[in-house]
Amino acid sequence: MKITDVRTTLLTGPCTNDPFLREARKLRSAAFIEILTDGGLIGLGETYAGYFCPETVPAIVDFFRPILIGQTVDDIPELWRRMYHCGNFWCRVGLGTIVLNGIEAALWDLKGKQLGLPVHALLGGAQFAKLPAYATGGPSNYPKERLAQKMDHYFSLGFRGLKVGAGSFTAGQGWYMPMEPKEAADFEADKVAFMRRHAGAEAWLMMDAHMGNNPVATWTLETATAVAKALEPFNLVFLEEPLHYTDPWGYAELCRATTTPIAGGECLTAAYEWRVFAQQDSFDIGQPDASFTGGLHEFMVVAKMMADRGRQVATHAWGAGGSLMQNVHAGFAAGNTRILEIAPDYAGLHSEVIDGGLVIKDGYVLPPDRPGLGIVLTEDTRRRYPFKPGSGEFNSVPGKILTD
């Protein structure tokens, strides 16, 4: 069975059905890549580039397309190597690698369908009978009564863990993010103490500082350390992205200074870029994304890098349904996965693509059992969510404000 074509589909739909996330973000875009064959099977993957800059994806897919025509899926890492090498001057990290990720995922999906096996079986097999899942909740909705309602909503959906952002978000007023060490530490400790009292001692709680892409200001190492130490009594699973990605050495110093586990890595592309962070022990828990890092195989390479340093990984997954399932398969195949990120109460670009293939029971995800990634992209889904140019998310900065 040989590849006959590679094509891109861009879509725009509701970001989520979660009423608490919809206060901050209403629409999302997505980029799906399909690989067609002379045997009739179609491989389907997603690149997280479709969430940020969807208009760029088709041109990059077309750049790589000739390398795949006439090929089989017998050796996916070799096909990936050829494409990566072809883009050597511009693709070693960044956008080219992110789009390549979606192509590689479609290749794995195709191979799984051809062999009748789930993708995690092709990556070495599921290393867990189940994995804990958390609801990724976006901002800390305020006032605190609203935050409590948010937690209760996620627990009602069957989650036992959740993650919220640093600072606060109040509908009609916007974001508040304390920056000075004492102010930030006091604010976050007060908030997490409230969350722990409300959720109970057994709930899995996480915080995302979002400092990897904060366009206005980022915490200094002093502020990040103060916050992390202030959160030590509350037994967080992790504190995510408390520093910018330009400072792996600062991250390493932060890890040494606190018992709060420090997580990060969602903005890193390819094992090549991850290596310095792994070697410096910059994260207690790395967060590769199997729709962004370069591919499911690259995810496995990163996971091994972290395991070799005695560290864990936790999937990052904020793309649509393809992205989510790519990360679930990779998370099960990696032997050092701590927890899976799951978009709660998701809308059509998740539910229709996943099509019942994600099973969560008592707060844990079970290994997917459908051939390939277990995702679909129907003609009805294409019709109902036509692409809207400009619907990709971008960081709001002076002169370029995010609208929805």
Predicted features by range, described:
Residues 3, 40, 64, 103, ...:
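Conserved, mostly hydrophobic/aromatic
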Residues 95, 104-142, 157-160, 197, ...:
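Glycine-rich, aromatic-flanked loop segments that form ligand/cofactor-binding clefts
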Residues 1-39, 44, 48-49, 347-351, ...:
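Structured beta-strand/loop patches that form or line metal/cofactor-binding pockets in enzymes
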Residues 130, 138-252:
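Metal-dependent enolase-superfamily TIM-barrel catalytic cores that perform enediolate-based chemistry
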Residues 36-115:
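Metal- or metallocofactor-binding catalytic centers and their adjacent structured scaffolds
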Residues 373-404:
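Extended hydrophobic packing segments that form well-structured cores
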Residues 43, 133-135, 160-164, 205-209, ...:
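Hydrophobic faces of well-ordered beta-strands that scaffold small-molecule active sites
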Residues 62, 229, 235, 244-372:
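Shared catalytic-loop signature of beta/alpha-barrel
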